[in-house]
A protein has these predicted regions:
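A generic alpha-helix structural signal
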Residues: 2-5, 59, 95, 136
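Detector for Asparagine
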Residues: 20-23, 27, 48, 70, ...
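C-terminal output/effector regions of signal-responsive regulators
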Residues: 29-95, 99-103
């Protein structure tokens, strides 16, 4: 069960949905678009990059259906492309470029906090799927 709420005052899109746990308790997860944007900017991904908006859209879709993390190429990129009037190849490339810029010029402390890794500079940026999964689970675990 999910629904979008668009508040009139600040025009923030808020996604609210319910997850049924094994014990049949209902947990409500609230992910705000502004929270996603703020986290990406803290990492160091510039908001003016096309990949930035694709990552935001991708994380919104993953919040609706975490199974997207198992179908990045043939599911997530295709659906992001549809929502953004683009192609799956452009979505993949722009997300990859935004991640690379973020890891090249971004805030290492923030990157280490989310990715639990101290030397991405040696390894380069994570793959798109690893990045999206790590950011998604960070947001879920920290209720952002």
């Amino acid at each position: 069960l999910f629904r979008f709420i668009d508040t009139m005052e600040d025009h923030q899109k808020v996604l609210i949905f319910t997850i049924n746990s094994e014990n049949d308790f209902k947990n409500v997860l609230r992910i705000e678009t502004s929270g996603i944007q703020k986290l990406l900017m803290q990492i160091g991904i510039p908001a003016n990059m096309l990949g930035f908006s694709y990552i935001v859209t991708a994380l919104e879709l993953i919040a609706l259906d975490p199974d997207y993390l198992n179908h990045i190429t043939k599911g997530l990129y295709v659906d992001v492309a549809k929502k953004c009037s683009s192609t799956a190849a452009r979505v993949e490339r722009n997300i990859r470029h935004a991640i690379e810029i973020g890891f090249l010029k971004g805030d290492l402390e923030e990157i280490e906090k989310i990715f639990h890794c101290s030397s991405y500079s040696d390894k380069g940026a994570p793959t798109n799927s690893k990045f999206l999964a790590e950011v998604y689970y960070y947001m879920v675990n920290n209720e952002l």
